[in-house]
Amino acid sequence: MATQTVEGSSRSRPRRTTTGNLLKPLNSEYGKVAPGWGTTPLMGVAMALFAIFLSIILEIYNSSVLLDGISMS
């Protein structure tokens, strides 16, 4: 027999801690999904703005955008 159950084994029940009690309400909404699109459009706008920001930084780094009054050495 590969597995065996022993009564009174060394397995103990999970302890209740103060931190666990404080974090329990955060996990109570697990698996629930709000109907509709929710904040998806807002996330899309944020991602687009971040992509624009990264492309501007990349252009400055590659010196393809020269800023007036700033010498790139």
Swiss-Prot record:
Question: Which Gene3D superfamilies does the record match to this protein?
Answer: Photosystem II reaction center protein H (1.20.5.880)
**In the UniProt record, does the keyword DNA-binding occur?**
no
What membrane topology does the annotation report for this chain? Answer: Single-pass membrane protein
Q: Where is this region: Disordered?
A: 1-21
Pfam families linked to this entry: PsbH
Residues bearing Phosphothreonine?
3, 5
What GO cellular-component annotations does this UniProt entry give?
Answer: chloroplast thylakoid membrane; photosystem II
Q: Which GO terms describe its molecular function?
A: phosphate ion binding
Span of the signal peptide: none
Membrane-traversing stretches: 41-61
Q: Which UniProt keywords apply?
A: Chloroplast, Membrane, Phosphoprotein, Photosynthesis, Photosystem II, Plastid, Thylakoid, Transmembrane, Transmembrane helix
Post-translation: what modifications? Answer: Phosphorylation is a light-dependent reaction catalyzed by a membrane-bound kinase; phosphorylation occurs on Thr residue(s) in the N-terminus of the protein.
A single GO BP term for this record reads: photosynthesis
Cite the InterPro entries for this sequence: PSII_PsbH, PSII_PsbH_sf
Q: Which family does it belong to?
A: Belongs to the PsbH family.
Assembly information from the UniProt record = PSII is composed of 1 copy each of membrane proteins PsbA, PsbB, PsbC, PsbD, PsbE, PsbF, PsbH, PsbI, PsbJ, PsbK, PsbL, PsbM, PsbT, PsbX, PsbY, PsbZ, Psb30/Ycf12, at least 3 peripheral proteins of the oxygen-evolving complex and a large number of cofactors. It forms dimeric complexes.
Q: What name does this protein carry? A: Photosystem II reaction center protein H
